[in-house]
């Protein structure tokens, strides 16, 4: 995008001051998008042209469902319409797009998840296996915690220490978890 319409208008130069967030959760009932990422605010190194605003729209769907199965061009058109409906951008502001489908992006906590400890105990028997990130740990860690599991693992490997137990303890502190019912 050349410009966001949100917040009285924002271009790449003043984006972080007007919208400091990396992502925005969307709860509007008339759109399907669940989260909007502003890649410029993650790091300027993620954006090839510093005069452009790179955003990502995340849709929480199931692999193989109707939305997942849309051709890329139709999905892009849908997303651009939603940007307009939310007042983020005008269709003419969109310069480029890419569609990425991430299967199993979020762990599922149903079925036999109550037996997860048996799986963890089994994989712990492999001395050279470090389970990291959401998919590796089958745990809903936020991005910071997911990256931290990898960083702690790499540090331990480089130092010759077995830190697999430490890795499993990342993001187990209660203050980091949302609670229902406030």
Regions found by a protein language model. Give the residues of each.
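Mid-domain catalytic core of redox enzymes
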Residues: 1-73, 77-88, 122, 165-175, ...
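C-terminal lid/capping helical subdomain adjacent to the catalytic/cofactor pocket in oxidative enzymes
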Residues: 100, 110-182
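Generic alpha-helical propensity signal that fires on short helical segments
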Residues: 42, 51-54, 73-77, 106, ...
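FAD/FMN-dependent oxidoreductases across multiple families
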Residues: 18-21, 30-45, 92-129
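Short Gly/Pro-enriched loop/turn and capping motifs at secondary-structure junctions
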Residues: 62, 104-105, 136-138
């Amino acid at each position: 995008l050349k410009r966001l319409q949100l917040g009285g208008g924002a271009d790449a130069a003043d984006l972080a001051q007007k919208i400091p967030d990396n992502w925005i959760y969307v709860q509007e009932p008339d759109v399907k998008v669940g989260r909007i990422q502003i890649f410029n605010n993650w790091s300027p190194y993620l954006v090839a042209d510093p005069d452009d605003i790179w955003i990502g729209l995340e849709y929480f769907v199931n692999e193989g469902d109707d939305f997942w199965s849309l051709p890329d061009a139709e999905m892009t058109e849908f997303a651009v319409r939603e940007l307009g409906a939310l007042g983020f951008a005008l269709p003419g502001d969109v310069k480029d797009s890419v569609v990425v489908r991430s299967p199993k992006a979020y762990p599922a906590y149903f079925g036999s998840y109550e037996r997860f400890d048996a799986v963890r105990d089994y994989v712990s028997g492999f001395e050279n296996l470090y389970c990291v990130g959401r998919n590796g740990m089958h745990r809903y860690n936020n991005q910071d915690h997911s990256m931290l599991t990898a960083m702690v693992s790499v540090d331990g490997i480089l130092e010759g220490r077995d830190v697999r137990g430490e890795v499993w303890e990342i993001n187990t502190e209660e203050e980091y978890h949302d609670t229902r019912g406030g």
